[in-house]
Amino acid sequence: HIGNARMAVVTDLLVRVLKKKYKNVLFVSNITDIDDKIINESEKLKIPFKEVTNKFSKIYNNEMLSLNVAPPDIQPKATDHIDDMILMIEKLIKNECAYVMNNHVMFKVESYKHYGKLSRRTLEEQLEGSRIEITDFKQTARDFILWKPSKDEQPGWNSPWGRGRPGWHIECSTMSKKLSLIHI
């Protein structure tokens, strides 16, 4: 996918510049090894989801090397950090930044006054032309999934909210916080 390659090349350039200028640069780039697309592919091929992610991770990493994109210093897999994700979600709920609705845990975007600061887009601008839909487990269209229930035949982990799996956003923030030792 050209979009993935573009992002990797741009990130590689940025990391190389930062490593020239600063002594302690740690480049962490995770592998999302659990999501709906992976589960669907696993079900279609009738193979475990880990086999799907291992296959495509290897292909991706080889393609990046062929583009002369340096590998990350650390390349964690989301499923290796499920317990940390659960702890972070619990903290977000405690701080009223997340809520549980219909067996889903959602991040309450309006609870974070700086949301959109990096993109320089207001909350209203972020909805323009978006593919976001209101569902029976969201208070507002902006809110996003931190934890979603898994069907019995799908991969899942036990949590205070029932058996399920993490949403994409919590994966990145949890691993960044843990592995980069940054405060989020």
Pin down the residues of each PLM region.
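NTP-dependent nucleotidyl-transfer catalytic core
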Residues: 2-183
